[in-house]
């Protein structure tokens, strides 16, 4: 399935139906009086978070969504039918922003969340509403109110417990494929991964979601390479596994490059709990392994894990450590959630 994480969409709620000018006509009733019904209300625009979606690809092919108009009122005091709503279905993690992309209108993080984005126009009054003691046969009715319209941006930030970050070809996709059922494209050239990928990791009977983020290079926050567009998906991660290619020229410099890009992006990415690992260690000689490990240790100011997704060395240790950090963060988030005060 193709991946799309942002889309610009036009939405419009339905116009209200017009009121009706009508008079009661029955045999033997000479002055039946007004009986024009009100117009129906226009349909609303809703956005709903549903299960089974992980991309906004549907909104590449359809960008305009309009709710139905309300029906006009009818005689015999019959109100027009309400216009049907239009519902935009999005995956969990979708933000709704205004046209300028500066104001977040809603953030849908849980399946089942549903918000009313635009309200349909009210129906107009029929002539029965205008009957007074001095005007027993009004010949006026109101038109329905117009619906609302606006352009919005849908922006998806994948919800994952942990994220894989690193330079291109650091072994992130290989690690994801080795630890989950995901099947990312793997090749020996930079930027093999062009879109984020998700997989479910199972460790000791417990699970967490792992995201593979496309590689960063120096200047990504300024648009170099594929830029930092996909770093938004890291914002929701509770922890990061930073993979540094052991076969790179200098492991310490590679680590610092990615850390600089995380700091330049902002939004607290450089403050997230981080586990540092030297990858592809099966391809290193003992002397080079020791040298790269020391370089990375000095740069990260912590002892890195040594792992190889191909041979399986250090993989389970990394996953268990990642799981412990994720569960610790989950517990901290639950502790911070406000609890309703008890009331008798």
UniProtKB/Swiss-Prot annotation:
Principal location listed in the UniProt entry: cytoplasm
Coiled-coil stretches noted in the UniProt entry, renumbered to this chain: none
Protein's UniProt keywords contain GTP-binding: yes
GO cellular component, one term: cytoplasm
UniProt keyword RNA-binding present: no
Cofactor: Mg(2+)
Gene Ontology process terms (BP): ribosome biogenesis
Protein name per its UniProtKB record: GTPase Obg
């Amino acid at each position: 399935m193709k991946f799309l994480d942002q889309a610009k969409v036009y939405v419009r709620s339905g116009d209200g139906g017009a009121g009706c000018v009508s008079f009661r006509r029955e045999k033997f009733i000479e002055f039946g009086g007004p009986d024009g019904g009100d117009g129906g209300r226009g349909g609303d625009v809703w956005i709903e978070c549903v299960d089974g979606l992980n991309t906004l690809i549907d909104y590449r092919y359809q960008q305009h969504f309009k709710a139905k108009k309300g029906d006009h009122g009818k005689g015999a005091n019959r109100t027009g039918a309400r216009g049907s709503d239009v519902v935009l279905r999005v995956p969990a993690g979708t933000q709704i922003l205004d046209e300028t992309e500066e104001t977040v209108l809603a953030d849908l993080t849980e399946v089942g969340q549903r918000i009313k984005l635009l309200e349909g126009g009210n129906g107009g009054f029929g002539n029965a509403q205008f009957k007074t003691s001095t005007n027993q046969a009004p010949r006026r009715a109101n038109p329905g109110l117009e619906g609302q319209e606006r352009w919005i941006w849908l922006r998806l930030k994948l919800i994952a417990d942990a994220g894989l970050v690193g330079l291109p070809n650091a072994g992130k996709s290989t690690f994801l494929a080795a630890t989950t059922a995901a099947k990312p494209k793997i090749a020996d050239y930079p930027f093999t991964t062009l879109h984020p990928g998700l997989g479910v990791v199972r460790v000791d009977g417990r699970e967490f979601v792992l995201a593979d983020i496309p590689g960063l290079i120096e200047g990504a926050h300024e648009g170099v390479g594929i830029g930092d567009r996909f770093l938004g998906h890291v914002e929701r991660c509770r922890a990061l596994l930073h993979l540094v290619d052991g076969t790179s020229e200098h492991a310490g410099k590679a680590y610092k490059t990615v850390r600089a890009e995380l700091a330049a992006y902002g939004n607290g990415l450089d403050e997230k709990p981080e586990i540092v690992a030297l990858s592809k260690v099966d391809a290193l000689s003992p002397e080079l392994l020791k040298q790269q490990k020391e370089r990375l240790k000095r740069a990260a100011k912590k002892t890195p894990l040594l792992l190889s997704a191909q041979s399986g060395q250090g993989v389970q240790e990394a996953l268990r450590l990642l799981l412990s950090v994720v569960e610790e963060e989950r517990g901290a988030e639950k502790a911070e959630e406000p609890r309703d005060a008890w009331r008798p």
